[in-house]
Amino acid sequence: MPTFDTTKQIFLCGLPSVGKTSFGRLLAQFLSLPFFDTDHLLSARFHGDSPKAIYQRFGEEGFCQEELLTLINLPVIPSVVALGGKTLLDKQIYEHITQRENILLVLLDLPFATLYQRLQKKPLPESLKNTPSLENALFQRLEKLRLLTPHIFSLQAATSLHEIGEVCQSFCLQFLTAQEIPYA
Protein backbone atom coordinates (compact mmCIF):
# COMPACT_ATOMS: atom_id res chain seq x y z
CA MET A 1 0.00 0.00 0.00
CA PRO A 2 1.40 3.43 -0.89
CA THR A 3 2.32 6.02 1.70
CA PHE A 4 0.00 9.03 1.76
CA ASP A 5 1.01 12.59 2.58
CA THR A 6 -0.99 13.44 5.70
CA THR A 7 0.64 16.82 6.33
CA LYS A 8 -1.90 18.87 4.38
CA GLN A 9 -5.06 20.63 5.43
CA ILE A 10 -7.59 19.27 2.93
CA PHE A 11 -10.52 21.55 2.06
CA LEU A 12 -13.49 19.91 0.33
CA CYS A 13 -15.91 22.12 -1.54
CA GLY A 14 -18.84 21.41 -3.84
CA LEU A 15 -22.50 21.96 -4.45
CA PRO A 16 -24.99 21.36 -1.64
CA SER A 17 -25.66 17.62 -1.08
CA VAL A 18 -22.61 16.47 -3.04
CA GLY A 19 -21.32 14.65 0.03
CA LYS A 20 -18.69 17.00 1.49
CA THR A 21 -19.50 16.10 5.09
CA SER A 22 -20.10 12.38 4.58
CA PHE A 23 -17.05 11.85 2.40
CA GLY A 24 -14.92 14.25 4.46
CA ARG A 25 -15.64 12.38 7.67
CA LEU A 26 -14.78 9.04 6.02
CA LEU A 27 -11.62 10.45 4.41
CA ALA A 28 -10.46 11.89 7.73
CA GLN A 29 -11.02 8.52 9.38
CA PHE A 30 -9.18 6.75 6.53
CA LEU A 31 -6.20 9.10 6.97
CA SER A 32 -6.44 9.26 10.80
CA LEU A 33 -6.82 13.05 10.65
CA PRO A 34 -9.19 15.39 12.51
CA PHE A 35 -12.38 16.33 10.67
CA PHE A 36 -14.04 19.75 10.70
CA ASP A 37 -17.35 20.73 9.11
CA THR A 38 -17.66 24.50 8.81
CA ASP A 39 -21.47 24.35 8.93
CA HIS A 40 -21.29 22.48 12.26
CA LEU A 41 -18.62 24.83 13.61
CA LEU A 42 -20.73 27.83 12.59
CA SER A 43 -23.80 26.32 14.28
CA ALA A 44 -21.81 25.70 17.45
CA ARG A 45 -20.76 29.37 17.54
CA PHE A 46 -24.47 30.26 17.54
CA HIS A 47 -25.49 27.77 20.24
CA GLY A 48 -26.86 25.19 17.82
CA ASP A 49 -28.70 27.49 15.40
CA SER A 50 -28.77 26.01 11.91
CA PRO A 51 -26.88 27.67 9.05
CA LYS A 52 -30.34 28.44 7.61
CA ALA A 53 -31.36 30.36 10.76
CA ILE A 54 -28.04 32.21 10.81
CA TYR A 55 -28.44 33.12 7.13
CA GLN A 56 -31.98 34.37 7.75
CA ARG A 57 -30.82 36.45 10.72
CA PHE A 58 -27.79 38.10 9.07
CA GLY A 59 -28.50 37.94 5.33
CA GLU A 60 -25.97 36.76 2.78
CA GLU A 61 -23.25 39.31 3.56
CA GLY A 62 -23.45 38.82 7.32
CA PHE A 63 -23.57 35.06 6.92
CA CYS A 64 -20.37 35.14 4.83
CA GLN A 65 -18.67 37.23 7.53
CA GLU A 66 -19.65 34.65 10.13
CA GLU A 67 -18.31 31.86 7.91
CA LEU A 68 -15.04 33.78 7.55
CA LEU A 69 -14.75 34.16 11.34
CA THR A 70 -15.38 30.43 11.69
CA LEU A 71 -12.55 29.70 9.25
CA ILE A 72 -10.20 32.19 10.92
CA ASN A 73 -10.70 30.26 14.17
CA LEU A 74 -10.13 26.90 12.47
CA PRO A 75 -6.81 25.37 13.56
CA VAL A 76 -4.14 25.32 10.86
CA ILE A 77 -3.28 21.64 11.24
CA PRO A 78 -3.33 18.58 9.01
CA SER A 79 -7.04 17.78 8.80
CA VAL A 80 -10.01 17.38 6.50
CA VAL A 81 -12.40 20.34 6.29
CA ALA A 82 -15.86 20.23 4.68
CA LEU A 83 -16.89 23.69 3.51
CA GLY A 84 -20.45 24.93 3.11
CA GLY A 85 -21.99 24.66 -0.36
CA LYS A 86 -21.38 28.31 -1.23
CA THR A 87 -18.52 29.16 1.13
CA LEU A 88 -15.73 29.24 -1.43
CA LEU A 89 -17.60 31.71 -3.66
CA ASP A 90 -17.01 34.53 -1.17
CA LYS A 91 -13.83 36.36 -2.22
CA GLN A 92 -12.55 37.00 1.34
CA ILE A 93 -13.07 33.39 2.33
CA TYR A 94 -11.42 32.10 -0.85
CA GLU A 95 -8.39 34.31 -0.22
CA HIS A 96 -8.21 33.25 3.44
CA ILE A 97 -8.20 29.56 2.52
CA THR A 98 -5.77 29.81 -0.39
CA GLN A 99 -3.28 31.89 1.62
CA ARG A 100 -2.93 29.15 4.24
CA GLU A 101 0.20 27.03 4.15
CA ASN A 102 0.21 23.47 2.82
CA ILE A 103 -3.42 23.11 1.76
CA LEU A 104 -5.18 20.93 -0.75
CA LEU A 105 -8.39 22.41 -2.15
CA VAL A 106 -10.60 19.89 -3.95
CA LEU A 107 -13.99 20.25 -5.62
CA LEU A 108 -16.15 17.17 -5.09
CA ASP A 109 -18.30 16.36 -8.08
CA LEU A 110 -21.19 13.98 -8.70
CA PRO A 111 -23.29 13.24 -11.76
CA PHE A 112 -25.83 16.06 -11.93
CA ALA A 113 -28.84 13.72 -11.90
CA THR A 114 -27.64 12.14 -8.63
CA LEU A 115 -27.03 15.54 -7.06
CA TYR A 116 -30.42 16.83 -8.17
CA GLN A 117 -32.13 13.75 -6.65
CA ARG A 118 -30.36 14.35 -3.34
CA LEU A 119 -31.42 18.00 -3.31
CA GLN A 120 -35.06 17.00 -3.78
CA LYS A 121 -34.95 14.97 -0.55
CA LYS A 122 -34.07 17.82 1.81
CA PRO A 123 -34.75 21.53 2.23
CA LEU A 124 -32.90 23.79 -0.19
CA PRO A 125 -30.23 26.13 1.15
CA GLU A 126 -31.54 29.69 1.56
CA SER A 127 -29.37 31.02 -1.26
CA LEU A 128 -31.05 28.64 -3.75
CA LYS A 129 -34.67 28.99 -2.63
CA ASN A 130 -35.74 31.95 -4.74
CA THR A 131 -33.89 31.16 -7.95
CA PRO A 132 -36.06 31.04 -11.08
CA SER A 133 -34.31 27.86 -12.21
CA LEU A 134 -32.62 25.64 -9.65
CA GLU A 135 -30.88 23.71 -12.40
CA ASN A 136 -29.37 26.87 -13.93
CA ALA A 137 -28.35 28.22 -10.52
CA LEU A 138 -26.56 24.96 -9.72
CA PHE A 139 -24.79 24.86 -13.09
CA GLN A 140 -23.62 28.47 -12.67
CA ARG A 141 -22.38 27.82 -9.15
CA LEU A 142 -20.57 24.67 -10.28
CA GLU A 143 -18.84 26.55 -13.09
CA LYS A 144 -17.62 29.20 -10.63
CA LEU A 145 -16.34 26.51 -8.27
CA ARG A 146 -14.51 24.78 -11.13
CA LEU A 147 -12.72 28.04 -11.93
CA LEU A 148 -11.66 28.49 -8.29
CA THR A 149 -10.46 25.00 -7.46
CA PRO A 150 -7.29 23.46 -8.83
CA HIS A 151 -8.45 19.88 -8.26
CA ILE A 152 -11.67 17.97 -8.96
CA PHE A 153 -12.59 14.58 -7.57
CA SER A 154 -15.59 12.69 -8.90
CA LEU A 155 -17.50 10.84 -6.22
CA GLN A 156 -19.56 7.79 -6.93
CA ALA A 157 -22.36 6.44 -4.81
CA ALA A 158 -20.47 3.96 -2.63
CA THR A 159 -22.62 1.86 -0.35
CA SER A 160 -20.50 -0.88 1.19
CA LEU A 161 -17.57 -0.32 3.54
CA HIS A 162 -15.30 -1.87 0.92
CA GLU A 163 -16.51 0.59 -1.75
CA ILE A 164 -16.13 3.54 0.63
CA GLY A 165 -12.58 2.45 1.39
CA GLU A 166 -11.86 2.24 -2.34
CA VAL A 167 -13.19 5.77 -2.90
CA CYS A 168 -11.02 7.13 -0.07
CA GLN A 169 -7.99 5.28 -1.41
CA SER A 170 -8.68 6.58 -4.92
CA PHE A 171 -8.77 10.16 -3.57
CA CYS A 172 -5.48 9.62 -1.74
CA LEU A 173 -3.81 8.06 -4.77
CA GLN A 174 -4.90 11.01 -6.89
CA PHE A 175 -3.91 13.80 -4.50
CA LEU A 176 -1.86 12.57 -1.54
CA THR A 177 0.63 10.01 -2.78
CA ALA A 178 3.90 10.83 -1.04
CA GLN A 179 6.85 11.34 -3.32
CA GLU A 180 9.37 8.59 -2.85
CA ILE A 181 12.90 9.83 -2.25
CA PRO A 182 15.40 7.80 -4.26
CA TYR A 183 18.45 6.55 -2.41
CA ALA A 184 21.73 8.19 -3.45
From Swiss-Prot:
The record's section on Gene3D superfamilies has: P-loop containing nucleotide triphosphate hydrolases
List the CDD domains. SK (cd00464)
State which pathway it belongs to.
Metabolic intermediate biosynthesis; chorismate biosynthesis; chorismate from D-erythrose 4-phosphate and phosphoenolpyruvate: step 5/7
Q: Where in the cell is it found?
A: Cytoplasm
The UniProt annotation places ATP binding at 17-22
Q: Which cofactor does it need?
A: Mg(2+)
Entry annotated with the keyword Coiled coil: no
Which Enzyme Commission numbers does its entry carry?
2.7.1.71
GO CC field: cytosol
Subunit field text: Monomer.
Q: What does this gene product do? A: Catalyzes the specific phosphorylation of the 3-hydroxyl group of shikimic acid using ATP as a cosubstrate.
Known NCBIfam families for this protein?
Answer: PRK00625.1
Q: What is this protein called?
A: Shikimate kinase
